């Protein structure tokens, strides 16, 4: 575990929290753009003639494809250059790509636009995690990470609520004649509108200061890759245990999140507007409160001197998620399903602050963006790609019935949720060994 650097004072609290809030807004926008697709599965399928499996690839693989190719090199750049500027450019890029989704006239062009969204978003979180670790001391870092991760749920909720409201005014299956663009479907209009806020946010980000790096031993140069892999190899149980644990948790989150709107449509006959309003509010209140409370609980445990307090908070959340994720798709009424989905969002958000803070504490400053990119790569390959696709494959090829979607969701969660806890416990044991080695 890396001891705190002492060369410079920490930034003023007001400056640090302003940066955390602006970065949270960037994360919010990223998830608005990402989650909006889940609300539009049915109209896009109808217009483009896509299957559930094809839509799952559009939701997961298209985003991950360029994240894999772009995320790691951009993170390497972030470890040696201005992270704020990287984030500002990334926001601008994915916002243009989101608007391009509204211009798509075929599945192939929509897939290509989603690839560009992934390329842009690949520059956000690794740089943001690294910046936050230079803004906040160890006893406050988990809380700051929790605030940043609130963006996941704010973004998901905004996509659902605003998407539902827009769908009430401009039905996704309707056709509108727009100047220059001609006949445009309602779902395409939503993507065009979503591209606008990011351009403004990329300008706001310029008001955030790039924090001084808190390096150890006067080493201000980026670490060579050989040193990076040597550091990683000496702590592989910690890094891969935590990474796989969160990847499997996100597999459950993305696998359910991508299909929950379709779940309510198919099982309970809800409209797009009804889903957006009700499910969106659940995500907003439960997810954001979980991320905020979980981050502060982890910081409180860490501040009390409890060994691996950050991760103990996550262990509680992972454990509670197991029965909830398996049970919610099987509820006989939409109200019971929504109640359990609310609990699922709360405890999923509860876990992030402590887990992310642990990864930053475990890593030297000039390796943090690259480690964060590796973490994001893992959770996107396993979670973002496999989650929606796993549910779709079980629906299409195991049950062979779109109406059995709720069974497919429950089956997927019954495998992934317990495995996520096992991996996290392995990671915690690895952190304990790394701490003991650092004390020798």
Where in the sequence are the language-model features?
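Extracytoplasmic gate region of multi-pass secondary transporters
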Residues: 37-38, 237-291, 349-352, 356, ...
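Helix-breaking motifs and short loop linkers at transmembrane-helix boundaries and internal kinks
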Residues: 49, 82, 103-109, 120, ...
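Juxtamembrane intracellular "pre-TM" segments in multi-pass secondary transporters
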Residues: 5-12, 211-242, 267
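Extracellular/periplasmic helix-loop-helix junction of adjacent transmembrane segments
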Residues: 40-69
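Helix-loop-helix hairpin linking two adjacent transmembrane segments in secondary transporters
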Residues: 148, 152-206
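Cytoplasmic helix-loop-helix junction between adjacent transmembrane helices
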Residues: 113-152
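Central cavity-lining transmembrane alpha-helices of secondary-active solute carriers
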Residues: 60-75, 281-294
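Conserved MFS/SLC helix-loop-helix module at the cytosolic interface between two early adjacent transmembrane helices
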Residues: 69-107
